[in-house]
Amino acid sequence: MSDQNDKKVEIIVFPYHGQGHMNTMLQFAKRIAWKNAKVTIATTLSTTNKMKSKVENAWGTSITLDSIYDDSDESQIKFMDRMARFEAAAASSLSKLLVQKKEEADNKVLLVYDGNLPWALDIAHEHGVRGAAFFPQSCATVATYYSLYQETQGKELETELPAVFPPLELIQRNVPNVFGLKFPEAVVAKNGKEYSPFVLFVLRQCINLEKADLLLFNQFDKLVEPGEVLQWMSKIFNVKTIGPTLPSSYIDKRIKDDVDYGFHAFNLDNNSCINWLNSKPARSVIYIAFGSSVHYSVEQMTEIAEALKSQPNNFLWAVRETEQKKLPEDFVQQTSEKGLMLSWCPQLDVLVHESISCFVTHCGWNSITEALSFGVPMLSVPQFLDQPVDAHFVEQVWGAGITVKRSEDGLVTRDEIVRCLEVLNNGEKAEEIKANVARWKVLAKEALDEGGSSDKHIDEIIEWVSSF
């Protein structure tokens, strides 16, 4: 534990129940608890059952879990119906929890809610509790979402986004059938323009954003400062960076026994993956992972497979079993000498491994954060929403990788993938990128070290709550 004086404060952490959301907010909870504030994680019954014994055995009463929603019978419920049901039931339970914690902590309570659950802020304010929106996306993405949300409402921004930002239209391209959902092509917003209904659903997180008492981002100051992103956001909101929210053993090593995220929705095959990497030379393996929500066509999977087959490097590909069925016949057998394909693997352990040369990623924010923190160059293959925005920053602002160019029909061809891998692994550009990511690795650790920007911001949050 930190040597900071005990504070009689209660931080209620309320994540959305996806793995990426849960992991980052749990790491934030650990940092808060390590500094001797009390944390309650309000989550679903299934998540509580998975995590409760492990978390509470490690943290005692510093971190407790409170189940506020029974999701045990949801397997056959459609996504939108499930979200509506979750909001209705969890809202009532969250309200009761806030009342209870206010009494126990003498009003020194803060609700840290997932930015994708904006209704939680309204409930907090109804009970006189301050609310901090915690975003699983980058600061640049939320700035873009906010700007686009204002546009859909027919409002103009007082200050335009800095020039470094890509056009707002970028996040509306290539919106796929996410999680197998099908959306109508377009709906009309208040400003009379047509938008993807999935985009409008995502933009709901901005509906009461200006009322939030604090905005928290899984980044660090040095990463947000280029392009004046932090400066622009700070003109509108109270913003603090508190990242990277990684297990301490992988970065600053200040928190004893903090060795993993603590929540996994998948069964991870650690041994075969790491043993295979151990057998490979340093910087000889391309790691490919596109997250849990990306679904590619058979044609696109074939292009990726043929690119990996024709390029000379070893590769490790984490690809879900449903996606493996789209691969060319005998691909695994034909590439067995240089490739390993698993349905999932321990990404933190993979990215810190000395055999990894680069990371082919869909540009989910957690993946980018991990790659930057571990100094791994990236080949960005973004699809939709925040991914193109973050890919733009990876290449154009942070100099940490390159982005594939798509054909006119949206396909990433095998030749393009091979070309990008060659640029990323060999030559002057590769050396420039390696130097940049090495710098970001150092800065990420410095942010969490004692007195670093994120470390200080977490202290300031606790002091702020103790002043209520």
Swiss-Prot record:
Keyword check for Iron, yes or no.
no
UniProt key word NAD: no
Pathway assigned in UniProt: Secondary metabolite biosynthesis; terpenoid biosynthesis
Organism, scientific name = Saponaria officinalis (Common soapwort)
Spell out the Pfam families in the cross-references. UDPGT
Its GO biological process annotations read: glycosylation; saponin biosynthetic process; triterpenoid biosynthetic process
Q: What is this protein called?
A: UDP-glucosyl transferase 74CD1
> What's the gene?
UGT74CD1
| EC identifiers of the protein | 2.4.1.-
What is the active site of this protein?
21, 114
UniProt: UDP-alpha-D-glucose binding residues? 20, 292, 344, 347, 362, 365-367, 370, 386-387
Q: Which InterPro entries match?
A: UDP_glucos_trans, UDP_glycos_trans_CS
Give the practical application: Soapwort saponins possess anticancer properties and are also being explored as enhancers for endosomal escape in targeted tumor therapies. They may also serve as precursors for vaccine adjuvants.
- What's this chain's function? Component of the oleanane-type triterpene saponins (e.g. saponarioside A and saponarioside B) biosynthetic pathway, leading to the production of natural products with detergent properties used as traditional sources of soap.
Q: Which PROSITE patterns match?
A: UDPGT (PS00375)
GO molecular function (one): UDP-glycosyltransferase activity
Q: Which family does it belong to?
A: Belongs to the UDP-glycosyltransferase family.
Q: Which terms are listed as keywords in the entry?
A: Glycosyltransferase, Transferase
Query: Its domain of life?
Result: Eukaryota
